[in-house]
């Protein structure tokens, strides 16, 4: 016998809405309920929120507990925060109900070094309920960690890995452009970064930690540098209608590295700014053989993130129990034709 995978979604922000639309399109997914704390969404039907025809029977609940009392979910998908501390109570609630968990929380993509105690608790709880928990996304979760890990498979030896993600941020949604500082003065950029009003890119450390563990480098120094603003050389108007004068911030550069015995082994670089003339994702493996992969045009972040989440549903359900990372799951791939068997 086979049937669709049942899913409850928590979080209907800009990225959550994109994922919800894809859930509704997938023939192997049954989106049972959506949860969001926004009072303006209370008891509204999902189709009106997403401005689509599908999903008319799905209403928005204010709490996960209510949704779980109504429906049994194979997977609870959480898209609420980058902070694991904030997301952990929802994860625990989902696990206790017997549901697997997939989350876009960047800190969950590799939480073991930054949250050792909490990671141990989540792992033990998930194993006690025979479910799995994973943090994912296009980045962290795939392009700058899992993909370079997999690309090393045909290498006899690996000395050094460099990954670069180059983005034209003008093509991305408004919250992304704002979190990388678009439209700020250089002084405002640094003040807001320091006060965590804007986050810049989150996840380079987690990506390095995942690569380091997968390849067994055992790096003794991992460092993320402060994000550096990129200044616009001309006046422009953002995709959401804000005028940005010449000399103001139009994006940022973030980078992180890992060393072993003073030798650099991993270098990650994330560059995103408006009207970037070249978009790509590149991976260089210095080893035997040397490998250079470049995805011309890059992978669209929002489309890719939604696809990663939705394609992961069958993989997570069939994975071993516990707190996992993307490298621990069955090989990720397109899964629309995969149904649940019982």
Regions found by a protein language model. Give the residues of each.
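Rossmann-fold NAD(P)-binding glycine/threonine-rich loop
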Residues: 106-131
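Active-site-lining helix/loop region of Rossmann-like oxidoreductase modules
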Residues: 6, 10, 14, 152-279, ...
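Short, ordered loop/turn segments at secondary-structure junctions
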Residues: 37-39, 81, 105-109, 138-139, ...
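C-terminal helical cap and adjacent loop that interface with cofactors, partners, or active-site loops
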Residues: 273-342
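General beta-strand structural signal in soluble alpha/beta enzymes
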Residues: 103, 133-136, 162-163
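N-terminal Rossmann-like dinucleotide-binding module
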Residues: 1-51
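Rossmann-fold NAD(P) dinucleotide-binding segment
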Residues: 66-75, 84-106
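Conserved N-terminal Rossmann-fold NAD(P) cofactor-binding segment
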Residues: 38-71
